Amino acid sequence: MKQLPITEARAFNVSYNGLVNVLVSDIGISSPFQGPPPPDITQKQYKAIWDTGATNSVVTRAIVNDCGLQPTGVTTVKTAAGERLANTFLVAIWLPNHICIPSLRVTEGIIGGGIEVLIGMDIIIRGDFAVTNTEGKTNFTFRMPSLRCIDFVKESPPTVIFEGQTVRVPSRSDPCYCGSGKKYKRCHGK
């Protein structure tokens, strides 16, 4: 997998007006290609669900028909409904950040809910992916290629809830937050 130089990293963000349990974005599908995109390439727009529980990406029969895709093989897929055989296809997937994955093997499947594409970990592992739910609004963002580790533990000081209040976790030799006068490591830090 060819990684883009950091100077070419691109990102997109999808914000919702409330909390959601399904992450959806617009994406494009076209015929696969090698090298730079051909000038006459046409992509068709679809709604995609982003699913970290899916190993690989999936397209529906409607996309297969709409794009005139030809099967490249058959594989066994494992879903919540069990194992089954599925046709495979090569497609180019155009993400909202204007990055294209020019030749990706996808399987045919049933998605439902008006969604035609499932974006799986085969795409998500190529970049940085984060979901937040600040102020009761879901937001998800993706950039490619990966630029840095996102670690909420390192970004936030450690805290505990003590008697209904959030307090910073003291270092092991600090006085304990409970007011006992003992060192934290000999009190609540055991």
Where are these regions (language model features)?
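Pepsin/retropepsin-fold aspartyl endopeptidases
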Residues: 1-177, 184-190
